[in-house]
Amino acid sequence: MAKDDVIQMQGEVIENLPNATFRVKLENGHVVLGHISGKMRMHYIRILPGDKVTVELTPYDLSRARIVFRAK
């Protein structure tokens, strides 16, 4: 999949789930299932409920997202 096919949005983590998965509430009100990107796993970046994150959504499945950045 090409990089320009993704949709980037801002959101807030509302719940931790098993296997590095999180429930994220987007700024438009939708709730999606998000998993941590590979680079964030490699650098041991911790994500807690309440953190503001940037997620990437694919146009094919808008209910799942990849967490690519955690704001301070």
UniProtKB/Swiss-Prot annotation:
Its main location: cytoplasm. It is found in: Cytoplasm. Pfam families: eIF-1a (PF01176). GO terms for molecular function: ribosome binding; rRNA binding; translation initiation factor activity. SMART domains: S1 (SM00316). One of its GO terms (cellular component) is cytosol. It comes from the Bacteria. Keywords: Cytoplasm, Initiation factor, Protein biosynthesis, RNA-binding, rRNA-binding. Residues 1-72 form the S1-like domain. Belongs to the IF-1 family. One of the essential components for the initiation of protein synthesis. Stabilizes the binding of IF-2 and IF-3 on the 30S subunit to which N-formylmethionyl-tRNA(fMet) subsequently binds. Helps modulate mRNA selection, yielding the 30S pre-initiation complex (PIC). Upon addition of the 50S ribosomal subunit IF-1, IF-2 and IF-3 are released leaving the mature 70S translation initiation complex. This is Translation initiation factor IF-1.
